[in-house]
């Protein structure tokens, strides 16, 4: 059975990469295609895209949320990111081929945050592998349950009964259909999630602008108050000087 994988995972803290994991591409005719252009994609390309295009758009959201980038960063790939619920300055980014199950990057990005540390490439690769193994085991279990319930392993006897091979092919097709439906639903959810992220970002920007305006208004008010005090003081001294001069003039006269 096909083993699904992710293409690239990177962990960033305070704007610096602390670990990364790259999975070389493998051709498989059953689940999507790998083009020659895909095969030329390197970890450096993924890393540069993350630094230049992903991090500037990251909006920390509480609750271990995963966001899908709606912008097409690179043909044939989807990009997902999540911020650490306990440390918003830690960002997890994952690239997958577009035909991979969308639940997979969600499982990866959420699962990585449950580990105590992903501080080295070896640790990150090990943790990603464990999550992928768990996902693969679930698919195998689902396939076996479907096979057992679809004819109980009947073989062909010439009377139109399904062979084990036919049942296996039907099961594979069913898994593909389930994955496609799941992808469509998750895509809709993640699109809403990105809109929420953008709304949070805009709200944060508005709050920041409001605070800056409020501080400027207070500063201007203080400047105007001091200017008023200076004007009153100057006017007072002018009046005193004028009165003193007038008094001396009349006194000497």
Curated annotation (Swiss-Prot):
Membrane-crossing residue ranges in chain numbering: 232-252
GO molecular function: SNAP receptor activity
BP-aspect Gene Ontology terms: intracellular protein transport; vacuolar calcium ion homeostasis; vacuole fusion, non-autophagic; vesicle fusion; vesicle fusion to plasma membrane; vesicle-mediated transport
Intervals, Vacuolar compartment: 253
Keyword match Transmembrane helix: yes
Cytoplasmic face residues: 1-231
Any Pfam family hit: Nyv1_longin
Region (Disordered): 147-166
Principal localisation: membrane
Record's bilayer topology term: Single-pass type IV membrane protein
Listed SUPFAM superfamilies: SNARE fusion complex
Disulfide-bonded cysteines: none
Superkingdom classification of source: Eukaryota
GO cellular component, one term: vacuolar membrane
Ranges of compositional bias, category Low complexity: 148-162
Protein's UniProt keywords contain Transmembrane helix: yes
Subcellular compartments: Vacuole membrane
Keywords: Coiled coil, Membrane, Transmembrane, Transmembrane helix, Vacuole
Residue intervals of the v-SNARE coiled-coil homology domain: 167-227
Subunit details: Present in a pentameric cis-SNARE complex composed of the v-SNAREs NYV1, VTI1 and YKT6, and the t-SNAREs VAM3 and VAM7 on vacuolar membranes. Interacts in trans with the cognate t-SNARE VAM3 during the docking step of homotypic vacuolar fusion. Interacts with the vacuolar transporter chaperone (VTC) complex and the vacuolar Ca(2+)-ATPase PMC1.
Similarity comment text for this entry: Belongs to the synaptobrevin family.
Note: Present with 1885 molecules/cell in log phase SD medium.
Name of the protein in its database record: Vacuolar v-SNARE NYV1
Organism annotation: Saccharomyces cerevisiae (strain ATCC 204508 / S288c)
Record gene name: NYV1
């Amino acid at each position: 059975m096909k083993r699904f994988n992710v293409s690239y995972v990177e962990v960033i803290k305070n704007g610096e990469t602390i670990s990364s994991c790259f999975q070389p591409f493998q051709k498989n005719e059953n689940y999507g295609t790998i083009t020659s252009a895909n095969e030329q994609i390197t970890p450096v390309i993924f890393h540069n895209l993350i630094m230049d295009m992903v991090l500037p758009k990251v909006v920390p959201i509480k609750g271990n949320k995963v966001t899908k980038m709606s912008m097409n960063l690179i043909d044939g790939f989807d990009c997902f990111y999540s911020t650490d619920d306990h440390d918003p300055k830690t960002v997890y980014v994952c690239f997958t081929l577009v035909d991979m199950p969308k639940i997979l990057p969600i499982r990866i990005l959420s699962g990585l945050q449950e580990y105590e540390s992903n501080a080295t490439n070896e640790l990150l690769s090990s943790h990603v592998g464990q999550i992928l193994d768990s996902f693969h085991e679930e698919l195998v279990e689902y396939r076996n349950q479907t096979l057992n319930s679809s004819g109980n392993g009947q073989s062909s006897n010439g009377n139109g009964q399904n062979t084990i091979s036919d049942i296996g092919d039907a099961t594979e097709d069913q898994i593909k259909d389930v994955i496609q439906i799941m992808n469509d639903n998750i895509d809709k959810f993640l699109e809403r999630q990105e809109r929420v992220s953008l709304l949070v970002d805009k709200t944060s920007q508005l709050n920041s602008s409001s605070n800056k305006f409020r501080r400027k208004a207070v500063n201007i008010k203080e400047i105007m108050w001091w200017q008023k005090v200076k004007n009153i003081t100057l006017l007072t001294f002018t009046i005193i000087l004028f009165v003193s001069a007038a008094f001396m003039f009349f006194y000497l006269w």
